[in-house]
Amino acid sequence: MNKLKILDIDLNVARKLGINKVKKYCILPIKEESNKVIVFASKDITDNKEEIEFIFNKKVEIFKVSEEEIEDLIYKSFLGEQENLVEIILSKSIYEIASDIHFEPQREDIIIRIRIDGILVPFAKIKNQEYQKILSQIKVLGNMDITERRKPQDGKAYIKLGDKDYDLRLSTIPIVYGEKLVIRILYGEIFNHDINNLNLSTFQREKLNKMISMKNGLILINGPTGSGKSTTLYSILKEINKNDVNITTLEDPVEVLIKGINQVSLNKKANITFATGLRSILRQDPDILMIGEIRDEETASMAVTASLTGHKVYSTIHTKTPKEVFFRLEDMGVKSYLIKDSLIGIISQRLIKTLCNKCKGIYKEVKINDKFITSYKANGCIYCNYTGYRGRKSVSAVVYIDEKIKILISNIFQEIKELSNEEMILNLRYLIENGFITVDDYNRFLIEEGLNYEKNRIII
């Protein structure tokens, strides 16, 4: 049984026997049909079948599932009956390292989904009256208008679970069947990544070390939304955070707190934008600046100017390839000679989902780069929410803008494209050769990123 079946459960049917009976018998009624009731069970219920048929006044059709699956479904189906529901949902989501929690009103019930590793995973179903209690509690926490249901609202809240503090960003919007609520979880000081987690080759690490050791210049991390740019940026900040430098960041918002670094959040009401904030920070005697994102002409111009006047500047930019970084900066009004003089490195990256170590299975021997390797396939278990995947790895290109590239500045776009494509393919080969990804995902990545599929594909 796939975990997605939680979406098909009729809560009125599932809860009809009560929590004590379903736990005792290791069963869960799923739905009623005209002449029968569908029941999932993890063990023989012959002795209890007659009782269940009497309660429902219908015949019982039994489907066998594993004990861990039935326990998981029972927990998710009866979740809404528990006390401290907000704390339970937040605790479980944080345990799964989820980035967002979605409460989605349907015609009859509320579906809860959580975003893990960039993918929304069905988490539970609760009844509307149970959701209204959650919604009211969250609105109070976020200083939102508890009576307003017709307009979108945004809020912030801070909670403490155990000995850890978490920052929540709250958003409601009216949809057809009620108010949808999304909670974004910011993990603050709980950040376990560093440069060693970035899946860089020895050669890439050497180039990155050169880039971060330079006293001034601009380093940009590029990629689409959700490609891990912020994680890479914070990992670098942890690496360069020393007692003898003044590091100041400007973020929207501050997602990870790092001791010893001065971090500033954008604030529209206080007129702190990327441009105005950067102007003020430059008066604070900074050695190193981190700008969450270069979005407009003024920020781009100031970032380049700062990097040319003795500061080290790190930032992200929304482009797909390293060569597009140059086009984007030029579009923002930065002169090409200033880009050449200021830019010392580009890190271009994507994320690819990795197989669950608990349940992945051997698939077959495949040939890659003139050698045979064992490839693996996704299966699915409770640990990975029955997706077959757990976690993500980055596929990166580290482009060090050295004198060779600066001399060839007239051909820089083609030069950078060739360098970055080659590095991404090497990263990708490492992941397939070490059993992190499937052959299908390997080939799909080549196609999606335009990495010469015909030349580099694995033929099954």
Segment roles from a protein language model:
Residues 5, 54, 61-91, 95-100:
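Charged, low-hydrophobicity low-complexity segments
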Residues 4-13, 77-83, 456-460:
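Long, charged amphipathic helices and adjacent flexible linkers at domain junctions
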Residues 83-460:
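Short, flexible helix-loop junctions that flank or precede catalytic/ligand sites
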Residues 2-5, 75-77, 194, 264:
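Short, basic, glycine/proline-bearing loop/turn elements
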Residues 2, 23-28, 57, 63-78, ...:
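Short alpha-helical interface patches
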Residues 36-72, 198-212:
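Short glycine/Trp-rich loop-beta-loop segment that forms part of the substrate-binding cleft
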Residues 1-54, 154-160, 171:
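Polyanionic, low-complexity intrinsically disordered segments
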